[in-house]
């Protein structure tokens, strides 16, 4: 769950089977697409929020990433209070036996978020949505949908094996043969690996998940390449 500190507006939230960095990035990207780019992002110290990829995403967005102090419950007071509210006003009132899928659960969560955002909040003497809309300091909007996608690309470096493959999260991918034995910069969205590519001299070279049968029958080029130009060793 992502909450706007000033207005208490729920700007992002979704239920997943796993709590991981990829899923948090998905929720954050959706929140920014809808409500804009925050000046600061204040998150927990868990591995889903304290990792190199999120740091690079925030740099691309121009967001200051801050983490709560370890074992300091008071620093997460607003969030913890909201989770208590969510449980008491919504979760505990659900007929769990009638929910048959995660998608249905998330539809109900979205309904709760809309209701919460438009319900009077005594602490701010307004509804969260009204307080957000009346704020003088509105978040920056993304330059474009494509720009926002590019900001959320995960970035890693890999050395290409002699069979023209690399591995990402234990999955093998084919890369263009011209990069064999070179170190390459990879850009990808964890929830859309079909769009992954090598970035070299501002050009994109698509990669694809390896078909082992096809790969073992592929002829490799023996053409000499100056790997120093692409970050590898001669």
Locations of the language-model features?
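Acidic/histidine-rich, metal-coordinating catalytic segments
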Residues: 34-51, 69-71
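Active-site beta-loop-alpha junctions of metal-dependent nucleic acid enzymes
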Residues: 13-37
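Hydrophobic "anchor" residues
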Residues: 9-10
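An acidic- and aromatic-residue-enriched active-site/binding cleft used to recognize and process polar
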Residues: 5, 15-18, 45-47, 63, ...
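Short, acidic, Ser/Thr-enriched surface-loop or helix-capping motifs
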Residues: 4-5, 199
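C-terminal, beta-rich DNA-binding module of retroviral/retroelements integrases
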Residues: 117-234
């Amino acid at each position: 769950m992502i909450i706007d500190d000033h207005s208490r507006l729920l700007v992002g939230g979704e239920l997943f089977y796993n709590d991981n960095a990829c899923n948090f990035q998905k929720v954050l990207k959706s929140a920014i697409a809808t409500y804009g780019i925050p000046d600061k992002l204040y998150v927990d110290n868990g591995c889903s929020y304290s990792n190199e990829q999120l740091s690079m995403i925030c740099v691309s967005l121009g967001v200051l990433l801050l983490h709560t102090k370890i074992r300091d419950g008071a620093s997460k007071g607003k969030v913890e209070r909201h989770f208590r509210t969510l449980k008491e006003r919504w979760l505990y009132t659900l007929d769990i036996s009638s929910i048959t899928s995660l998608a249905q659960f998330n539809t109900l969560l979205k309904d709760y978020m809309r209701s919460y955002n438009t319900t009077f909040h005594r602490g701010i003497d307004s509804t969260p949505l009204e307080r957000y809309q009346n704020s003088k300091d509105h978040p920056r909007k993304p330059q474009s949908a494509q720009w926002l996608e590019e900001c959320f690309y995960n970035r890693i470096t890999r050395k290409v094996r002699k069979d023209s493959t690399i591995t990402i999260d234990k999955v093998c991918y084919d890369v263009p043969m011209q990069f064999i034995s070179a170190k390459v910069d990879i850009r990808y969205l964890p929830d859309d690996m079909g769009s992954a590519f090598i970035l070299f001299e501002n050009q994109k070279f698509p990669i694809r998940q390896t078909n082992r049968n096809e790969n073992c029958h592929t002829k490799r080029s023996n053409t000499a390449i100056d790997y120093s130009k692409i970050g590898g060793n001669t």
